[in-house]
């Protein structure tokens, strides 16, 4: 707050302008032209310069170049699809896999009804919701790691 110039409300000129509904820009730093004409274009041009400079000076590849004559043995999806990919891959029936994936939002919808007497926002005071979140998180991580392994180790992760 020390940077902003505070109005002097004992000034009779300012009090007269404020009484008429004017004088709101009598104090402080005006947005025009200081911010809109000078600061904003500098920030925008600086952002463009950083993006273009990084693109020219340090280009990155998106992975291995595509080879139309050599198809990989197993095509993996993006990392955020690993749990559902592994679930569909491990379950023998595809309908069972789709129903298992539909069970996730259905389970999340039922949590507030199970815990409807508890109105707290603190997660430590909502044990059922916290338990559902923790179990779901660890299950998703487990299935995600298993998606990168061969199908015989996809569920056990090679531990047993």
UniProtKB/Swiss-Prot annotation:
Its main location: plastid. GO terms for molecular function: electron transporter, transferring electrons within cytochrome b6/f complex of photosystem II activity; electron transporter, transferring electrons within the cyclic electron transport pathway of photosynthesis activity; ubiquinol-cytochrome-c reductase activity. The chain crosses the membrane at residues 36-56, 95-115, 131-151. It holds the Pfam family Cytochrom_B_C. It is found in: Plastid, Chloroplast thylakoid membrane. GO terms for biological process: mitochondrial electron transport, ubiquinol to cytochrome c; photosynthetic electron transport chain. Keywords: Chloroplast, Electron transport, Membrane, Photosynthesis, Plastid, Thylakoid, Transmembrane, Transmembrane helix, Transport. CDD domains: cytochrome_b_C (cd00290). It is a multi-pass membrane protein. InterPro entries: Cyt_b/b6_C, Cyt_b/b6_C_sf, Cyt_b6/f_cplx_suIV, Cytochrome_b_C_euk/bac. GO terms for cellular component: chloroplast thylakoid membrane; mitochondrion. Belongs to the cytochrome b family. PetD subfamily. The 4 large subunits of the cytochrome b6-f complex are cytochrome b6, subunit IV (17 kDa polypeptide, petD), cytochrome f and the Rieske protein, while the 4 small subunits are petG, petL, petM and petN. The complex functions as a dimer. Component of the cytochrome b6-f complex, which mediates electron transfer between photosystem II (PSII) and photosystem I (PSI), cyclic electron flow around PSI, and state transitions. This is Cytochrome b6-f complex subunit 4.
């Amino acid at each position: 707050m020390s940077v902003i110039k505070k109005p002097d409300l004992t000034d009779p000129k300012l009090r007269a302008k404020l009484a008429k509904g004017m004088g709101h820009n009598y104090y402080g730093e005006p947005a025009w032209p200081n911010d809109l004409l000078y600061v904003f274009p500098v920030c925008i041009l600086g952002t463009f310069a950083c993006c273009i400079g990084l693109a020219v000076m340090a280009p990155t590849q998106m992975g291995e170049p595509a080879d139309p004559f050599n198809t990989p043995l197993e095509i993996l999806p993006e990392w955020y699809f690993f749990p559902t990919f592994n679930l569909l891959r491990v379950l023998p029936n595809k309908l069972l896999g789709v129903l298992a994936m539909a069970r996730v939002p259905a389970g999340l919808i039922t949590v507030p009804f199970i815990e409807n007497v508890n109105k707290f926002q603190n997660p430590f005071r909502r044990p059922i919701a916290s338990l559902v979140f923790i179990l779901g998180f660890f299950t998703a991580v487990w299935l995600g790691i298993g998606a990168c392994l061969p199908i015989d180790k996809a569920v056990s992760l090679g531990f047993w």
